[in-house]
């Protein structure tokens, strides 16, 4: 598949425990086969331009120095995993030259076009990045009801400790996507979701996104800091940024 899809989605975050906080907002994601997608589709440009596009160097490796799908293939090879099918990248676009993706997803398919491996690429506001490998031990296809766990080892929010485990659920269908991430801790935790329909990217959909959300990921950063201020105001404990893990992926 070489089509580029535009997910006009919705994300919801809810803090669990004694100090609760929740918010929902609309968001734009792109889903594309980064190895085969066209370099240009109307206003959209891949690896060039500033208005609305996606750069491979923004993903797959260190922030700003990524290698795209080549990094994904190297990661899989390190686990002795073959990737016979397409590799889709689900990520927010660059808008007016700026991008910040709190989490992007590499969706890897088997030879029968079934999702069997996901890499959740997490980036914090300090410019650190760590990725979580989500799969079954026998590499069977990931079903919508499956729950895949990964220990949390990366600092995301200064108001959450580095403890507990993430439980991921992926419902990736031809017509829509649904992703649920449940941070489970002895006390508290966070639930985050991303849902939305899959539609073909077009100049019309891009212009709609620019009109509705003209600041793109700058808006996302602003909302993150707004929620941090709300948590601080409610009395949440602030934790300074620790040294990030040496491993790129776990």
Residue ranges and their predicted role:
Residues 1-250:
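Mature, function-bearing regions of proteins
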């Amino acid at each position: 598949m070489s089509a580029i899809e535009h997910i006009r989605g919705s994300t919801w975050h809810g803090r669990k425990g004694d100090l609760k906080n929740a918010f929902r907002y609309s968001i734009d994601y792109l889903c594309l086969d980064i190895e085969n997608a066209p370099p240009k589709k109307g206003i959209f440009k891949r690896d060039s331009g500033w208005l609305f596009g996606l750069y491979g160097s923004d993903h797959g490796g260190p922030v700003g120095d990524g290698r795209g799908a080549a990094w994904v293939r190297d990661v899989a090879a390190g686990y002795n995993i073959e990737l016979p099918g397409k590799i889709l990248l689900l990520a927010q676009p660059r808008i007016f030259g700026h991008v910040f993706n709190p989490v992007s997803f590499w969706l890897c398919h088997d030879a029968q076009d079934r999702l069997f491996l996901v890499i959740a690429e997490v980036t914090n506001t300090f410019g650190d990045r760590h990725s979580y490998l989500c799969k079954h031990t026998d590499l069977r296809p990931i079903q919508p009801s499956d729950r895949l766990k990964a220990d949390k080892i990366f600092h995301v929010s200064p108001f959450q400790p580095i403890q507990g485990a993430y439980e991921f659920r992926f419902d990736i269908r031809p017509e829509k996507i649904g992703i649920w991430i449940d941070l489970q801790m002895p006390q508290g935790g966070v639930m985050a979701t991303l849902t939305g329909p899959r539609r073909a990217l077009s100049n019309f959909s891009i212009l709609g996104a620019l009109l509705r959300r003209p600041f793109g990921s700058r808006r996302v950063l602003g909302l993150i800091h707004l929620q941090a201020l709300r948590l601080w105001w409610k009395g949440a404990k602030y934790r300074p940024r620790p040294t990030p893990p040496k491993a790129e992926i776990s």
